[in-house]
Swiss-Prot record:
A motif ('KMSKS' region) lies at residues 596-600. Monomer. GO terms for molecular function: aminoacyl-tRNA deacylase activity; ATP binding; isoleucine-tRNA ligase activity; tRNA binding; zinc ion binding. It comes from Methanococcoides burtonii (strain DSM 6242 / NBRC 107633 / OCM 468 / ACE-M). Pfam families: Anticodon_1, DUF5915, tRNA-synt_1. Keywords: Aminoacyl-tRNA synthetase, ATP-binding, Cytoplasm, Ligase, Metal-binding, Nucleotide-binding, Protein biosynthesis, Zinc. ATP binds at residue 599. GO terms for cellular component: cytoplasm. Catalyzes the attachment of isoleucine to tRNA(Ile). As IleRS can inadvertently accommodate and process structurally similar amino acids such as valine, to avoid such errors it has two additional distinct tRNA(Ile)-dependent editing activities. One activity is designated as 'pretransfer' editing and involves the hydrolysis of activated Val-AMP. The other activity is designated 'posttransfer' editing and involves deacylation of mischarged Val-tRNA(Ile). Belongs to the class-I aminoacyl-tRNA synthetase family. IleS type 2 subfamily. IleRS has two distinct active sites: one for aminoacylation and one for editing. The misactivated valine is translocated from the active site to the editing site, which sterically excludes the correctly activated isoleucine. The single editing site contains two valyl binding pockets, one specific for each substrate (Val-AMP or Val-tRNA(Ile)). A motif ('HIGH' region) lies at residues 48-58. This is Isoleucine--tRNA ligase. Its cofactor is Zn(2+).
């Protein structure tokens, strides 16, 4: 039996109850098992790092995923949705280092790599459990019992297998290249892991002396003076013009400088030169091969052995000096220039960011501390032209926030550059939401892609499965645990992490011993193999063939250069195709002013904070409806509260008929739609049609991954169609005591609409949907699906669709709104009836709407009658006013214009309008002369009669005739009395079926007579078995109150009838 529910939407109570219900009934597993054998839908969960509490961004991410998966499940899809966890890498290591008080890799080595690995594992697993609980609080359904975890050996084997494919396809290589380097973590980091922040650095202009020309210098500019000890060359653009300038300094010294011609004046101004003369010009091509002296060759002995010369490079820009200092060991472009020109790759900097012995004087110094020392040495030699500080964007390590450097180191690379064109072709086959995420943003990133550095010089990660012979230097890549055991004789149960796997050796064909290289994988390579590792590939090839590639993935827009990219790269290496079919790119969560949420700023909002205040479903519906998924979400507490009010309105709409249904023992199994179809009114047919339209709208939006449109369609339906319209139309029909078919028709319609609405909100607000379903369906039919999430998604019933009726009702609602506005103008409350409303329409459809929905309009406008004029015609009871138009009269009648205006003003407006119907008419002036005037010389306006209000709407004008009659006053005062008594019933907390005794004292005899005319009506409406109304009635009872009703004092007393 359907039960009544609480007055208020108590999200926390409902969600706790629903979670317990799901757990007790193993709901998630039941839903997944129920869809076995249906069309497969493979979802890969982009794995969050197990580093701590979830934040609003990760909450939004999982809510999007959960909503789409619930929708697909109800649409009969067999879903594979293992939750994913990224459990390796610096995100974990830095957290553990912080907990242990470590500051460098040396501390880890001292502590013991094995001990550190165990601490990382413990931390990752503990945080995984905590975060799982937080996601479950949001109502997120994934396979939490069998998640994929990158620390598991089966997952590690998928990564190993992938690297072996790279080797087999000649896509794996090792060598020295310049990479992003974190000197604190002492490891390479990916481009996607570099976070840019503003910082101040030296802006220095430095002179390099030409070897064979006295007092002649090429001028370079740099913000990294610490790289000068590593300088090998100077690059100029081959097509730029350069000037050889004779410059006079402040001390009147003369020197010759080489600078890009268009930059000469700016550079000399910065260098504080007094005057200059251009001696000659040449192209960058002419400068190629010019030899210069290293400015610090005496301090860095190895530099004295190297010939330094000017070379050409097309990437040089016409800013600063037009001459670029080249240090191949400290810049990606510099490295490429070095390789092209066969320069030595000189890199006298160690992994901790300190100079090595190769740096001579600077050995042991931290490079950033050395900036000042280098500049002083240059100054001492007269080679520092200028220095100042500038603020610019500079890269920092994503985890420890240390400023990165560029360092030439030995690394392992996947040859992504060779696959670039194939990758670009593959992404064209992927369905992107929004479209430009793939065709523009992702495409641009791939076009600029370089070979992927997959190695990291750390501990907690997937060990790179490369073994190298210490005798002959030959390499081998191991693809699986089985292969490793077979080739090494290692313990079959060996763990595949460091330091355990480091101890395993493999015999080499040369008779030597192969040892594993110490590097671990880039953590992005871990998650890159997720789509096949999730399927336990390579061990379960059949499952892989059934499910792969993924049908759907979604992550934030930063993942165009992160997970979307790494997956594509690894998949192209392994399989030669994209690993996903459909991608939704979503935005970031920001604070209300559009700033990134940050603990340091203090603007972070935790999901738990929102849930404690409003509940998980409100958070879910807010993040899903507030903006398009791909737009950044600016979190706003007021907007969140508005969404919560909308959910509360849904609750109240759902709650409204339940007491009446319970009182009447309404059983939808016994009252079929067919049994009441003949008794459906226009409003019933309309809401059923609107329900079908909303189903179609939600289907269209969800199929296009436009979750915001789906949510907004549902919210609009609940707010505008159900709460503000349909419930108002049918409310009196639910109060009828008799078991009549009209009331049963309303019950049946409401029931169907509520059950369908519950199914529509199930993907988005699963807790509220479940609560509604259990009461409406399971309380009636114990054989119905145990949970709403086992139900099929609503299907549009074309037989119920009536687009014409929907259009007419839209017009009717506009008329009602206009009528309300017109009432306000004459000060007449809606509670008071009016004798009629008149609609002056602009089209025939409006007339059809009025005629088709006359009873609805009369009821909602509280009018005794409704009339229409012909299309385009004014109401014939309107008055007409006329005024002369000086702008049209003056140019024609010149000095006589005043007399013409006076004559027009003295005439009857109706006569004028009639006379000018043909365009012009003749009028007489005061002096007896006649003149001809045109219609443009008179302005006409309509006036409404007294006690009539008017208001325009999009299809015409509504007039409300608010003249008072005896009957209207009687009904008006009676309705005022009824409202007061109903308020008093609520104050006494009476049930809808409780009867009362009432006594009403009215001091005004005229009003008393008016109210007495509706005595029986009042008694019926307030369920009064006894109702006494008079001048001197004794007003005692359980509750007595004095009221001022339209200026008339009244005292009302009521008591519950026992």
């Amino acid at each position: 039996m359907i039960k009544e529910v609480t007055d208020q939407y108590n999200a926390k109570e409902i969600e706790t109850k629903v979670h317990e219900f799901w757990e007790a009934n193993n709901a998630y597993r039941s839903v997944r098992e129920h869809r076995k054998g249906a069309k497969k839908f493979y979802f890969v969960d982009g794995p969050p790092y197990t580093t701590g509490h979830i934040h609003l961004g990760t909450a939004w991410n999982k809510i999007i995923k959960d909503s789409i998966l619930r929708y697909m499940s109800m649409n009969d899809h067999d879903i594979l949705d293992r939750a994913g966890w990224d459990m390796h890498g610096l995100p974990i290591e830095v957290k553990v280092e912080g907990a242990l008080g470590f500051e460098s890799k040396k501390d880890i080595e001292t502590y013991g790599v094995g001990n550190f690995i165990e601490k990382c594992k413990e931390f990752a697993l503990r945080q995984k459990d905590d975060m799982t609980e937080q996601f479950q609080t949001l109502g997120v359904w994934l396979d939490w019992e069998d998640p994929y975890m990158t620390l598991k050996d089966e997952y590690i084997e998928a990564a190993w297998w992938t690297l072996k494919q790279a080797q087999d396809k000649n896509l794996l290589e090792t060598g020295k290249r310049v990479v992003n380097w974190c000197p604190r973590c002492e490891t390479a980091i990916a481009d996607a892991e570099v976070e840019y922040e503003d910082r101040e650095d030296p802006s220095t202009y430095i002179k390099f002396k030409l070897k064979d020309e006295d007092n002649t210098f090429v001028v370079i500019w740099t913000t990294t003076p610490w790289t000068i000890p590593s300088n090998i060359a100077v690059a100029v653009h081959p097509e730029f013009e350069y000037s050889k300038v004779k410059a006079i300094s402040e001390n009147s010294a003369t020197e010759i400088l080489i600078i890009a011609s268009e930059l000469v004046e700016n550079v000399l101004r910065i260098g504080r030169y007094l005057d200059y003369e251009i001696l000659s010009t040449m192209s960058g091509k002419d400068l190629e091969g010019t030899v210069y002296e290293h400015p610090l060759a005496d301090l860095v002995p190895l530099q004295a052995e190297i010939e330094h010369r000017i070379c050409n490079a097309d990437y040089v820009t016409a800013d600063s000096t037009g001459c670029v200092h080249i240090a191949p060991g400290h810049g990606v472009d510099d490295f490429e220039v070095g390789v092209k020109n066969e320069f030595p790759i000189f890199c006298p900097v160690g992994p901790n960011g300190s100079y090595t012995h190769e740096a001579g004087k600077y050995c042991g110094m931290n490079i950033l501390d050395a900036n000042r020392v280098v500049m002083d040495d240059l100054l001492e030699r007269g080679l520092l032209m200028a220095e100042r500080m500038i603020s610019h964007r500079y890269g920092h390590c994503w985890r420890c926030k240390t400023a990165i450097i560029y360092l030439a180191t030995e690394q392992w690379f996947l040859k992504i550059g060779e696959l670039k064109e194939d990758m670009l072709e593959e992404i064209k086959k992927v369905n992107w939401t929004p479209e430009w995420a793939g065709s523009a943003r992702f495409k641009d990133w791939i076009e600029g892609a370089r070979d992927w550095c997959i190695s990291r010089q750390r501990y907690w990660g997937i060990p790179i499965p490369v073994w190298k012979c210490s005798s002959c230097n030959s390499l081998t890549v191991v693809g699986t645990r089985k292969e490793l055991i077979e080739r090494s004789g290692a313990d079959p149960h060996i763990e595949l992490h460091r330091p355990y796997v480091d101890k395993v050796t493999i015999p080499c064909e040369c008779g030597g011993t192969m040892k594993r290289v110490e590097d671990v994988f880039d953590v992005w390579f871990d998650s890159a193999v997720a789509s096949w590792a999730t399927l336990r590939f390579p061990h379960q090839k059949e499952k892989f063939n059934e499910w792969w590639p993924a049908d759907f993935i979604t992550e934030g827009h930063d993942q165009t250069r992160g997970w979307f990219y790494s997956q594509l790269g690894a998949s192209m290496v392994a399989f030669g195709k994209a690993p996903y079919k459909n991608v939704l790119m979503h935005g970031f969560t920001l604070d209300g002013s559009g700033k990134k949420m940050s603990k340091s700023i203090g603007n972070v909002i935790q999901p738990a904070e929102v849930i404690d205040k409003f509940g998980a479903d409100t958070l879910r519906s807010y993040v899903l409806s507030a903006s398009a998924p791909w737009e950044d979400l600016k979190f706003n507490w007021d907007e969140l509260a508005t969404v919560h009010r909308t959910n509360n309105i849904l609750w109240n709409v759902y709650r409204f008929p339940l007491p009446y249904m319970a009182l009447d023992d309404f059983d939808p199994q016994k009252v079929s739609y067919e049994s009441v179809e003949a008794y459906l009114r226009s409003e019933d047919k309309w809401i059923l049609s609107r329900m079908q339209t909303v189903i179609a709208e939600v289907n269209k939006a969800m199929d296009a991954r436009l979750l915001h449109k789906a949510m907004r369609s549902i919210n609009e339906f609940v707010l505008e169609d159900l709460s503000r319209w349909y419930i108002q139309l049918i409310r009196p029909r639910t109060w009828v005591e008799a078991d009549n078919p009209d009331k049963l028709a309303v019950y049946r319609v409401l029931y169907d609409v509520f059950v369908t609405t519950a199914k529509l909100i199930a993907p988005f607000m699963p807790h509220l949907a479940e609560e509604m379903y259990q009461n409406l369906v399971r309380n009636i039919d114990e054989n119905a699906p145990v949970t709403i999430h086992l139900c099929d998604w609503p299907v549009v019933n074309e037989a119920l669709v009536d687009t014409s009726l929907e259009a007419q009702m839209k017009v009717a609602r506009s008329i009602v709104e206009a009528s309300s506005n017109a009432r306000q103008k004459v000060g007449r409350k809606l509670r008071w009836p009016v004798s009629r409303i008149v609609v002056s329409p602009t089209d025939e459809n409006t007339i059809a709407a009025v005629e088709g929905l006359r009873s609805v309009l009369m009821d909602q406008t509280n009018a005794k009658d409704i009339e229409t004029t012909k299309v385009g015609e004014s109401w014939n009871e309107l008055g007409v006013e006329s005024t002369p138009n000086p702008g049209a009269i003056g140019p024609v009648f010149k000095g006589n214009a005043g007399n013409i205006s006076a004559a027009i003003g003295a005439m009857d407006a109706y006569d004028l309008k009639k006379g000018l119907a043909g365009g012009e008419m003749e009028i007489s002036l005061a002096d007896g002369t006649n003149v001809t005037i045109t219609e443009k010389m008179v302005n006409f306006s309509e006036t409404v009669p007294e006690d009539v209000g008017s208001a325009e709407f999009n299809c015409g004008v509504v007039f409300v005739d608010a003249k008072l009659t005896h009957e209207i006053e009687s009904e008006g005062y009676s309705r005022e009395v009824i409202r007061r008594i109903q308020d008093m019933r609520k104050e006494l907390d009476l049930d809808v079926d409780d009867s009362i005794r009432g006594h009403i004292q009215i001091s005004d005899e005229r009003v008393l007579d008016l109210v007495l005319d509706f005595e029986n009506y009042i008694a019926k409406e307030v369920r009064a078995n006894v109702l006494v109304i008079g001048l001197d009635v004794e007003t005692t009872g359980e509750l007595a109150k004095e009221w001022n009703v339209e200026g008339i004092p009244m005292t009302i007393a009521i008591s519950k009838e026992e």
